[in-house]
C-alpha cells in the first residue's frame, strides 16, 4: 500500500497535468496505431535510408517484417563514461542478427563533461547542451525508419536530453543502455587530502594531477554519486533500464550479457506490440514521482530538480519544486555515497545497490509499484539481481538486507528521516540545497549575505 502522502502528491500532479497529459497520451496512441513506419516511405526514401547497409540487410529492412532498431548514441572518447560506447553499435548489430532483427545508428548527439569544463568558459554551454541533445535525438528518429530505439548515454545533460528527445516519439519502444562505472581508484578521502595539500602549497601541480588521474583513471563513469550516476539510478527506478544494470563495470562478461539481454527485451517489446511498454506509457505521473523519490532517498544530484521537471513536461506532466520538497518530508535518506559519504558507487552496488534501494522503499510503501516498465508491469521485478549462468542473464532474488549499513540502510533505519534535498525560499529568491551533503551543525547558518552581479564575480 502506497504511503498516503505520496498518493496525495501524485494525485495532485495528475490533476494539475490532466489536460496536457491527456493530449500527450492521445497523440502517442494515435501515432502507435496509425504510424506506417517504413511502409509509408517512398522507394526513394527507403533507398536513401538503407543505402549503406549490406545486401542482406537491405532486403530485410525493405521487407518490413523484422524489427529495425535505431540507435541514438552520445559516444565520444573524451568522456570516460562514453568511451565504452565505441564498440556498442557493432556489438548490438551482432545480437540483433542472432535475434532476426537489424540495427542502424539513427543519429549522434553532443556529450559534454562538466568535469572538463567546470571553472572554464565552456561550462556556460552545459545546460544548453541538454536541449541540443534532445533536438539531435529527435532529428535522428524523425526518419521513420525504425521500430524501436536504443539509447547510449550516461553523463550529466545527456540522459535528460535523450529522455526529452525520446518522449517526443512516445509511441516508440525505447530502452537505455548504461556503460557502467570505472573500477574504484584512490579513495575519496585520499583525493580530498591531495587537493587540500595543493591548496596549502604543500605539493605542486604534478602531484595534484597524479592524484586526480589516480581517481579518474579508466573508461567508465566517474565513481562519485553526481549527476551521471544519478541518471543511472533514475533510468532504473523509472523502468527504462534493465534491473541491476546501472552499476556493472565496463568490459566485463556481465556487462556484455546485460547488453545482449537489453536487445532481447527491446525486440520482445517491439514484436509484442504492447502500447503499455512504449516510453510514453512507461513515463507517467507515477514513474516521475518514483524518480523524485529515488533522488531523495539516495541523495542524488540537485541538477535533477531541473531535469526531472523538463522530462516530465516532455511527457505532458507538470511537477514543481514544491512537489520535491513535500515528498522530501516523507522520504528517508538511506544512502551515504560520496559526496555525502566516503563510499563510491562501486561500494554502493556491492552493498545491495538499486535492488535493495527499491526493495526497502517498496516494502515501506514509499514507491509506486503499479507502474509500466521495459520488462513488464510492476516495479517488484527491479528488486531482483542479474546473475550470469552459462553466459546468460538470469534474475534471482535480490538482497533481503543491506550488506553494509555505513553505505546503505533500510527505510526503517535511515541515515536521515527526511530526504536529501530541500527547497529554500527567502527574499533573495528560491533555491535547492543538497542537505544530505551538509553537516547537521551547518543546517542553520547566520551570516551576512553577499550578492554578486554574475558568476564571474564570485571567482
Describe every region a protein language model picked out.
Residues 87:
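Acidic/charged coordination and interface sites in well-structured regions
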Residues 106-144:
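N-terminal small/polar loop signature for handling phosphorylated ligands or for N-terminal nucleophile
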Amino acid at each position: 500500500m502506497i504511503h498516503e502522502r505520496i498518493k496525495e502528491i501524485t494525485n495532485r500532479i495528475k490533476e494539475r497535468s490532466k489536460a496536457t497529459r491527456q493530449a500527450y497520451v492521445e497523440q502517442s496512441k494515435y501515432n502507435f496505431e496509425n504510424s506506417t513506419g517504413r511502409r509509408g516511405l517512398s522507394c526513394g526514401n527507403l533507398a536513401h535510408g538503407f543505402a549503406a547497409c549490406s545486401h542482406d540487410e537491405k532486403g530485410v529492412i525493405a521487407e518490413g517484417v523484422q524489427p529495425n532498431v535505431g540507435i541514438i548514441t552520445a559516444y565520444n572518447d573524451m568522456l570516460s563514461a562514453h568511451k565504452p560506447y565505441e564498440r556498442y553499435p557493432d556489438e548490438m548489430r551482432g545480437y540483433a542478427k542472432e535475434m532476426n532483427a537489424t540495427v542502424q545508428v539513427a543519429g549522434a548527439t553532443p556529450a559534454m563533461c562538466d568535469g572538463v569544463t567546470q571553472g572554464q568558459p565552456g561550462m556556460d554551454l552545459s545546460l544548453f547542451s541538454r536541449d541540443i541533445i534532445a533536438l539531435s535525438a529527435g532529428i535522428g528518429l524523425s526518419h521513420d525508419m525504425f521500430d524501436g530505439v536504443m539509447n547510449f548515454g550516461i553523463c550529466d545533460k545527456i540522459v535528460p536530453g535523450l529522455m526529452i528527445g525520446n518522449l517526443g516519439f512516445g509511441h516508440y519502444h525505447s530502452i537505455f543502455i548504461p556503460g557502467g562505472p570505472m573500477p574504484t581508484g584512490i579513495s575519496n578521502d585520499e583525493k580530498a587530502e591531495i587537493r587540500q595539500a595543493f591548496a596549502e602549497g604543500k605539493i605542486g601541480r604534478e602531484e595534484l594531477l597524479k592524484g586526480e588521474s589516480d581517481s579518474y583513471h579508466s573508461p567508465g563513469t566517474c565513481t562519485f554519486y553526481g549527476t551521471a550516476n544519478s541518471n543511472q539510478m533514475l533510468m532504473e527506478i523509472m523502468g527504462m533500464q534493465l534491473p541491476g544494470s546501472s552499476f556493472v563495470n565496463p568490459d566485463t562478461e556481465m556487462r556484455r550479457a546485460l547488453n545482449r539481454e537489453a536487445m532481447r527485451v527491446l525486440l520482445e517489446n517491439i514484436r509484442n506490440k504492447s502500447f503499455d511498454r512504449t516510453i510514453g506509457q512507461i513515463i507517467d505521473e507515477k514513474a516521475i514521482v518514483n524518480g523524485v523519490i529515488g533522488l531523495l532517498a539516495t541523495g542524488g544530484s540537485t541538477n535533477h530538480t531541473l531535469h526531472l521537471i523538463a522530462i516530465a513536461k516532455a511527457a505532458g506532466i507538470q511537477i514543481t519544486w514544491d512537489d520535491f520538497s513535500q515528498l522530501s518530508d516523507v522520504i528517508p535518506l538511506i544512502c551515504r555515497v560520496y559526496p555525502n559519504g566516503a563510499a563510491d558507487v562501486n561500494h554502493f552496488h556491492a552493498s545491495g545497490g538499486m535492488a535493495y534501494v527499491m526493495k526497502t522503499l517498496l516494502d515501506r510503501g514509499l514507491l509506486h509499484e503499479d507502474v509500466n516498465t521495459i520488462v513488464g508491469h510492476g516495479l517488484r521485478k527491479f528488486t531482483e539481481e542479474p546473475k550470469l549462468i552459462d553466459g546468460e542473464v538470469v534474475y534471482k532474488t535480490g538482497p533481503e538486507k543491506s550488506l553494509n549499513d555505513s553505505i546503505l540502510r533500510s527505510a526503517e533505519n535511515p541515515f536521515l528521516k527526511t530526504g536529501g534535498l530541500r527547497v529554500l525560499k527567502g527574499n533573495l529568491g528560491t533555491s535547492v540545497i543538497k542537505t544530505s551533503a551538509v553537516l547537521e551543525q551547518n543546517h542553520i547558518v547566520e551570516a551576512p549575505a553577499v550578492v554578486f552581479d554574475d558568476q564571474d564575480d564570485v571567482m
